[in-house]
């Protein structure tokens, strides 16, 4: 199967507070850890399933050490996105365009 991703993923585990919203109503808040992240999205392992169309607000906790790819911290603290895939391993979230981090483009 041909890889469809335009941008590489980095296997970086970041703490994320995930607020799930459906039809404008908050349905759940979870504290989770990413499995990987790219310029356009992230995969988050979870046993919780979400309905199609679920939107997310994400607050990432960034490590204090020198991760150069996260120098654009301001935009990362209040990121929004949408569910693009959900399976028994977790959820894939695509970031809204205003949440994309230039530092991750080069991975």
Regions found by a protein language model. Give the residues of each.
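Short, Lys/Arg- and Gly-enriched loop/turn segments at beta-strand edges
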Residues: 63-74
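N-terminal helix initiation/capping motif
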Residues: 1-37, 46-49, 107
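A generic structural micro-feature
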Residues: 6-10, 26, 72-75, 83-85
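C-terminal output/interaction extensions
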Residues: 23, 79-82, 88-107
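A structural micro-motif recognizing beta-strand termini
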Residues: 44-49, 96-98
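Generic short beta-strand segments
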Residues: 17-19, 59-65
